[in-house]
Regions:
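An acidic- and aromatic-residue-enriched active-site/binding cleft used to recognize and process polar
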Residues: 23, 63-65, 141-143, 172-177, ...
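Signature for HUH/AEP ssDNA processing cores
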Residues: 101-174, 185-193
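Active-site loop/lid in soluble adenylation, ligation, and acyl-transfer enzymes
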Residues: 2-131
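Short, conserved secondary-structure transition motifs
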Residues: 68-69, 180-188, 218-234
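Short beta-strand
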Residues: 60-63, 169-175, 215-219
């Protein structure tokens, strides 16, 4: 249960006092899940969840009015934030920049939920080296009518392609409709090269399973499961492992 002080309500997490607001606010109206329920969930899965978000800059995807309203994507971390939440400055090709939130522990997870986040969306880089990703990400995006079995079959093909090139593929079921596959890589290559590598993976998956998968860029040309390589672009984030997705079911 949250405690109270002269400064308002807070939740004790890992020795940190996390300021919270409106813990009883309903986030998922169909099933009655509240903000406090989400906080408890992320504390319970913190060990696993932090493997995907710790020390990484992340966009705050805020459902300030619950999942029935559109999310607000906030790149800039609030100026007023707890000491246990850091920020890393990302500079974009447009010439703009943003200091994005970086969390390190379970208290940071609770802070993100209190900000209105349902899912967590980190970049594939760590705060100490923003130019070189340490993850290659493959997003399997099913076209309408595609069944789950086909997505899984494509995932196995993608795993084979990655393993043929010396990479270990990890499945991640935190996609809203499809499937994510991650491979950890050395922090040696810039985003451009990592994206090109992911594009090559996608094309090879299509070559090996043309009846199941596509790497076609234009939506009207796609059939089956789209092997989305563009999630490796500099400005892209993907929902992390153990993320709750903002869907009614």
């Amino acid at each position: 249960m949250p405690a109270s002080s002269s400064k308002g309500q807070y939740l004790e997490v890992g020795g940190q006092q996390v300021p919270i607001t409106s813990p009883d606010k309903v986030v998922f109206p169909d099933i009655g899940v509240t903000k406090m329920d989400l906080m408890r969930y992320y504390v319970a899965v913190a060990e696993g969840a932090l493997r995907g978000v710790r020390d990484r800059p992340m966009i705050l995807k805020r459902f300030v009015k619950g999942i029935t309203e559109e999310a607000v994507f906030q790149k800039r971390a609030p100026e007023k934030r707890p000491d246990f939440v850091d920020a890393a400055e990302l500079k974009y090709a447009s010439g703009t920049s943003a200091k994005e939130a970086v969390i390190h522990d379970a208290a940071g997870l609770v802070w993100a939920v209190n900000m209105g986040c349902v899912d967590l969306n980190p970049h594939p880089v760590r705060a100490d080296d923003l130019a070189h990703p340490d993850e290659l990400r493959v997003d399997l995006d099913p076209m309408p009518g595609v069944q789950w079995r086909q997505i899984v079959d494509v995932a196995f093909v993608a795993r084979e392609v990655l393993e043929d090139h010396g990479l270990t593929a990890w499945p991640k079921t935190s996609g809203s409709r499809g499937f994510h596959i991650y491979a950890r890589i050395q922090r040696r290559w810039p985003f451009k090269f990592v994206r090109l590598a992911a594009q090559s993976v996608a094309r090879e998956v299509e070559r090996r399973a043309p009846e199941l998968a596509t790497a076609r860029w234009w939506k009207e040309e796609r059939e089956g499961v789209f092997v989305d390589f563009n999630q490796n672009a500099f400005d892209r984030t993907v929902a992390s492992a153990y993320s709750v997705r903002a869907t009614p079911d």
